[in-house]
């Protein structure tokens, strides 16, 4: 009977190990491919079979669906209940549990309506958008267009921010540019951005916003850069820390950085819900020339305005977001 020598045994085991690794790698690749394909297919089915047909219906009918959605979020799923309650208690330590529960339920109700409004955005007409979502003082922004200046519009995930993206190019004389973050589901990102950009707004992301701004500023094309600056910073060491809602909080400071680079006016806009499906945008100037202010002054003013907005009507902010994922209790105030 033939026996393998020591060297042959070693080579045999080594080859066997390599083959096993290749087999496992290929198996994992196939699993990932199947999962990715299923994810894409399910996203498309969700859009074409459910979301798009729903979006064609009048909002008066769609809002009827928001009530069962609210019941599911609140009583069946208890959607992110712990995160919402913790965020509210940290932000408003004087609230008792009864008040927290009341605001949580109001948030679920608002969040259900917001989901319906986002679905409607897919097929909403220009006329309907501008009838339901209007700026009370567009002249404050348009005066900078007349001066040939771009502007940075700072806001947050408060009330309906998606309709602002949709209508941005129609609200003001500037070319509207919404700055956002990538979605993990690329198919969903492509579909939702197609809806967002139907009426002229351009959507860019953190990885190409510098190129887009450079193009517009170099070619003197006045643009309104809409940036939601209340997100949790992905890099804690590169953020602005402020005392916000009773705690030290980190903020993305890209808005101020972009404004300073090109010395652009910075404005804050607040979205106010006047009634169901109708919103008003109030704009105010933070500064006309960032170069005249000390570093961090724009971000500080923004955090103060945002806090006032949230305190005026707490249920309309995005409380289900893990806003305080990073601990800044030992960090110094200001730019990190």
Regions found by a protein language model. Give the residues of each.
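N-terminal amphipathic/basic-hydrophobic helices that include classical n-h-c signal peptides
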Residues: 1-38
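Membrane-anchoring hydrophobic helices of lipid-metabolizing enzymes
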Residues: 26-155, 190, 194, 200
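Residue-level recognition of alpha-helix initiation/capping sites
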Residues: 79, 135, 159, 186-187, ...
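Short amphipathic alpha-helical segments and helix-helix/interface helices
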Residues: 138-142, 165-169, 189-193, 213-214, ...
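Catalytic core of membrane glycerolipid acyltransferases/transacylases, capturing the structured
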Residues: 147-207, 234-244
